[in-house]
UniProtKB/Swiss-Prot annotation:
The lineage of its organism: Bacteria, Bacillati, Actinomycetota, Actinomycetes, Mycobacteriales. It catalyses: tRNA(Tyr) + L-tyrosine + ATP = L-tyrosyl-tRNA(Tyr) + AMP + diphosphate + H(+). The gene is tyrS. Its EC number is 6.1.1.1. Residues 355-412 form the S4 RNA-binding domain. This is Tyrosine--tRNA ligase. It comes from Mycobacterium sp. (strain JLS).
Length: 423
């Protein structure tokens, strides 16, 4: 069973760990229980959470038992950031977010009655019952303020606007989670992003001091692209959310299909379960035939199916093909069509608004001016609903609107925009 570490190594998924030999020996001795925690600081998890989530799944597939911990308590405090205090949410809001995130967590690991069946916990169940006196005596007594002040994030905050005691104490709450999971489930390994190393190691020490047990810590790398930009940010700069109401399956798919050649093979290693042989073939295809974007299509398909399911992936792929003239637009359901167009640009068309094709091209941003629009039409570079427009006097008829209110405009091969008729 220790081969899980070899698997993680070749995928580049181990950033730091405590005693590697001891961890390997314990993994080889039999099934291990491990956990990773996820704080409900928003209504949904985002793409940045995928690495630790999928690492839990890899351990489960290797015969170990994962615990997914929803941070109903720690989410009310917030891990210190480099700049600024977090806005404290109400208990009801955090509880609602924790329930939503718990549902998302359950998609990534298998829950059954087997020895490797996953467990879901919420740290509010033990932290909420902890009195101030108990917290200070049973947890705080084991922590040196000098060590806590030496954390990079804390040090940067102290050099700036300072840090509240609330956020300063976050490390203690997370460390106590490890103690509780060790006592309840025999948990012996915590995994998380490399920015959590200090908190995780604090838990390892607290388990040793309070229970006399040796447990382990391992972190995964924080994912950036080849230009050093943070992974999982949408084109608008916001997070790429797992909740389809916050990031549509179409937007999710498009993010991954637009992955740079320099990043796609690494992303396939980190975010999919493809074997080395197939990854090698995709790496070769990217090197020798980059214009085909074979690896990007596989990445987008794998991750959309993982997060949203096979039906959503099929709908998204049909939408992508139809938008770019390789499928039937009328066959798309309206939610999929609307979501796809909103990832491009949508202009509204009112009953009194100008509806000449040149006006629509300018309104959607596909042309800089009516003159430019006329030139593009004359060159045969404009289509509406995948039908080429030959006249700059063209106006839409009622029958042209998909689902009674949508037009799909395209300039050239890849520039797409939408027009939405409003009444």
């Amino acid at each position: 069973m220790s081969s899980i570490l070899d698997e993680l190594d070749w995928r580049g998924l181990i950033a730091q760990s405590t005693d590697r030999d001891a961890l390997a020996a314990e993994l080889a001795a039999g099934p291990m229980t491990l956990y990773s925690g996820f704080d409900p600081t928003a209504p949904s998890l985002h793409a940045g959470h995928l690495v630790p989530l999928l690492t839990l799944r890899r351990f489960q597939q290797a015969g170990h038992r994962p615990i997914v911990l929803a941070g109903g308590a720690t989410g009310m405090i917030g891990d210190p950031r480099d700049t600024g205090e977090r806005t404290l949410q109400t208990a009801d809001t955090v509880a609602d977010w924790a329930d939503r995130i718990r549902g998302q967590l359950e998609r990534f690991v298998e829950f059954d009655e087997s020895p490797t069946g996953a467990i879901v916990e919420n740290n509010l169940s033990w932290t909420g019952a902890l009195s101030t006196i108990e917290f200070l005596r049973d947890v705080g007594k084991y922590f040196s303020v000098n060590v806590m002040l030496d954390r990079d994030t804390v040090r940067r905050r102290l050099e700036g606007e300072g840090i509240s005691y609330t956020e300063f104490s976050y490390m203690l709450l997370q460390a106590n989670d490890y103690v509780q999971l060790r006592k309840r489930h025999g948990c012996a390994l915590q995994i998380g992003g490399s920015d959590q190393w200090g908190n995780i190691v604090a838990g390892v020490r607290l388990v040793r001091q309070k229970l006399g047990d040796t447990v382990h810590a391992m972190t995964t790398p924080l994912v950036t692209d080849s230009e050093g930009k943070k992974f999982g940010k949408s084109t608008g700069g916001g997070n790429l959310w797992l909740d389809p109401e916050m990031t549509t399956p179409y937007a999710w798919y498009q993010y991954f299909i637009n992955t740079a050649d320099a990043d796609v093979v690494n992303y396939l290693r980190w975010f999919t379960f493809l074997e080395a042989g197939e990854l090698g073939e995709l790496e070769e295809a990217t090197r020798d035939r980059p214009h085909q974007r074979t690896a990007q299509r596989r990445l987008a398909r794998e991750l959309t199916t993982l997060v949203h399911g096979e039906d959503a992936t099929r709908s998204v792929e049909h939408a992508s093909q139809a938008l770019f003239g390789r499928g039937e637009l009328a066959a798309l359901d309206e939610p999929t069509l609307a979501a796809a167009l909103r990832e491009a640009s949508v202009a509204e068309l009112t009953p009194s608004g100008p509806d000449l094709i040149t006006d629509l091209l300018v309104a959607t941003g596909l042309s800089a001016s009516k003159g430019a629009a006329r030139r593009t039409i004359a060159e045969g570079g404009v289509s509406v609903n995948n039908v080429k427009i030959d006249s700059d006097e063209w106006t839409p008829q009622a029958s042209d609107f998909l689902h009674g209110r949508w037009l799909v405009l395209r300039r050239g091969k890849r520039n797409i925009a939408g027009v939405q008729r409003v009444r």
